[in-house]
Each structure stands twice: as C-alpha cells, then as structure tokens.
C-alpha cells in the first residue's frame, strides 16, 4: 500500500469511528416487583431468640444434621451448608435493654432475602439460580450448578453457602421451603420458620400486604397496644402486645432494588449487620455493565472490519498499478 492509500485508509477509519454512535451509558433500571410475589416480614422487636425457626428449618431441609455435632447458640448462629436460617444477637454495653442502642440487645433473622432483582441470578453462567416468575422465590437447581460460586461473591447479604464436603458439590440457601422435593407452599403449607414462630416475629404473605403491614406498624404510637398476627395476616391468630419504638425504616423496601423478605427493627439496621445498599439493584447494575461492554465491543469491531476491507482493496489495486508511485 502506498502512502496516499494509507492516509486515505486512516482517514476513512477516523471518519467511520466518528460516524458510529458512542457507547450508550443509559442508566440501569430496577425490575419491578412481581405482583403477588411471596415473602416474609421479620419484626426484630417481637423476636425472643428461641431459635424454634432454626430447628424447624433444619428438620425440613436438613434431616441429617451437621456432622460436627449438636447445634447450640454458640455454634448455630451462622449460615452454613447445614443451616439456611439463623438467629443472631447484637449487644451493646451491658446488653440488658431489648431493642435499645445503649446497653441493649436485639435479634436478627438471617436467610436469603429473595431480592426483587437478584444479583446471584444475574451472575450465574448456567442459570442454576432462577427467580420463579409467579412467586418471585429464588430457586436453586443443583443438577445444573457447575460449582463456580459466582453467586457467593455476588450476593450482598453473603447468603449462599457451598458444601465443600459433598463430593459433587452443592449450594445451600433458603427457598421458602418450596424447593423441589419439599414444596410446602405448593401443598398449602407455610415456610417452616413461619409455622413455628410463637411470637409472630416472622409472618408470611405477599410482598404488597407485608409492606402495608410494616408501614402500619411504623405509624403506630410507641407504648400503645396492637394485635400482632401470627403466621399470616389472615390467620385470625393474634395477640395483644405493646408497640415498641421502631427504628423509622423498613429494610428491604428499596435496598438493592428491594427484597421480598422485609425487616423491622428497634435499632439501626446497620447494627444488625444488614448492609447499606443503593436503591439500584445489584442485578440491574451488573447486567447493564455487561450489556454496555458487549455493545461497546461491536463498535471497534465494525471499524476494524471496514478498515480491513479497505486495506485489502487498496493492496489489490497496488498490485495492478505496479507498485509505489513514490509521491512525497
């Protein structure tokens, strides 16, 4: 290729690059909650820390207990391949005043939050994690899972746990007791933890009705009395209890795009190891980045293809012309 054709090709490449639109950085958007999606409301102020929910969860999901031995408060307060649901306690100072920041303590229930737009689903390369299109429950398929554990890194709540002792490998997380082989919800039952909670600290229902109930509680006057329901809002099983001073925030309404497990507390949620997250879901953010990268890759490839065709054509013309014209 002579100098004239080289300059011509370079100029055309620059024009092609300038003519192509720049990569769009349109803001990612949250996926809307599935209408009627199922979830739980956990009211930390009602929890008595009995761990009945933990035991029931293990009875349903792990009939063979952790081989490390009997579970007690000291070794059963962390999520593991043998425990999908746990109760942790936070303390401050002397730790004698329930749901108080000063010299107080509070309980927190930990399990999969069933995010509205879950990042674990977004990052899974083989779709071993899927969000049920009707219930919104995040389900796991062990037969598809490759054990890459991307979901463990992606989860902002550090929920999925991998069983390294299983020769085939397996992930464990809460599926609201409706996974294949259990299907309590499909059979008309309740998640085990909801069924056995004596204080109604965790109740089951649609995200919409649970959110309405949570906001109703936040509007109650501290010191007044309220009929708190057990199991579900429509169970008819309620008990009269003094309204605490709630921390004025419903966790899970907007955090990370929203969750189907909602939390009310009497102390700042940061104290209970609930992460502070942006309103934009992690799933939406990661997918937007992926799509932007893929779109961005196409532009330089298109330019490169155009330049390649132009160079090949000019090279062929050079052969026909008999070589360089030696212009300076």
UniProtKB/Swiss-Prot annotation:
The terms describing its cellular component in GO are: periplasmic space; plasma membrane
Q: Detail which positions bind [4Fe-4S] cluster 3.
A: 112, 115, 120, 155
InterPro entries xref list: 4Fe4S_Fe-S-bd (IPR017896), 4Fe4S_Fe_S_CS (IPR017900), FDH_Electron_Transfer_Unit (IPR051555), TAT_signal_bac_arc (IPR019546)
Q: How is the cofactor bound?
A: Binds 4 [4Fe-4S] clusters.
Q: Which CDD domains match?
A: HybA_like
Q: Keywords assigned by UniProt?
A: 4Fe-4S, Iron, Iron-sulfur, Metal-binding, Oxidoreductase, Periplasm, Repeat, Signal
Q: How is it modified after translation?
A: Exported by the Tat system. The position of the signal peptide cleavage has not been experimentally proven. Can also be exported by the Sec system.
Question: Can you tell me which residues bind [4Fe-4S] cluster 4?
Answer: 124, 145, 148, 151
Per its UniProt record, the required cofactor names are: [4Fe-4S] cluster
Q: What is this protein called?
A: Hydrogenase-2 operon protein HybA
């Amino acid at each position: 290729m002579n100098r004239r054709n080289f300059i011509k090709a370079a100029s055309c490449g620059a024009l092609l690059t300038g003519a192509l639109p720049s990569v769009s950085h349109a803001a990612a958007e949250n996926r809307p909650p599935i209408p009627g999606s199922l979830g739980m409301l956990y009211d930390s102020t009602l929890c008595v820390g009995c761990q009945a929910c933990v035991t029931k969860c293990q009875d349903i999901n792990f009939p063979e207990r952790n081989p490390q031995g009997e579970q007690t408060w000291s070794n059963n307060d962390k999520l593991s391949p043998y425990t999908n649901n746990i109760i942790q306690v936070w303390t401050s100072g002397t730790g004698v005043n329930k749901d108080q920041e000063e010299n107080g303590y509070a309980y927190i229930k930990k399990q999969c939050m069933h995010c509205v737009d879950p990042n674990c689903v977004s990052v899974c390369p083989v779709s071993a994690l899927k969000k049920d299109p009707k219930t919104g429950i995040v389900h796991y398929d062990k037969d598809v899972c490759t054990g890459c554990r991307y979901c463990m890194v992606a989860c902002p709540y550090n929920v999925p746990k991998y069983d390294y002792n299983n020769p085939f490998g397996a992930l464990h997380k809460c599926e609201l007791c409706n996974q294949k082989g259990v299907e309590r919800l499909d059979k008309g039952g309740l998640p085990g933890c909801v069924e056995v909670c004596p204080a109604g600290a965790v109740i089951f229902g649609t995200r919409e009705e649970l959110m309405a109930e949570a906001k109703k509680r936040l509007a109650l006057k501290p010191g007044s009395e309220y009929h708190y329901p057990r199991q579900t809002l429509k169970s008819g099983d309620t008990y009269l209890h003094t309204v605490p001073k709630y921390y004025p925030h419903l966790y899970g309404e907007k955090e990370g795009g929203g969750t189907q497990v909602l939390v009310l507390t009497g102390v700042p949620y940061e104290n209970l190891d609930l992460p502070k997250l942006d309103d934009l879901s992690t799933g939406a953010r990661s997918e937007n980045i992926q799509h932007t990268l893929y779109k961005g890759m196409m532009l330089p490839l298109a330019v490169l293809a155009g330049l390649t065709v132009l160079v090949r054509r000019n090279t062929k013309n050079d052969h026909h012309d008999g070589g360089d014209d030696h212009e300076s």
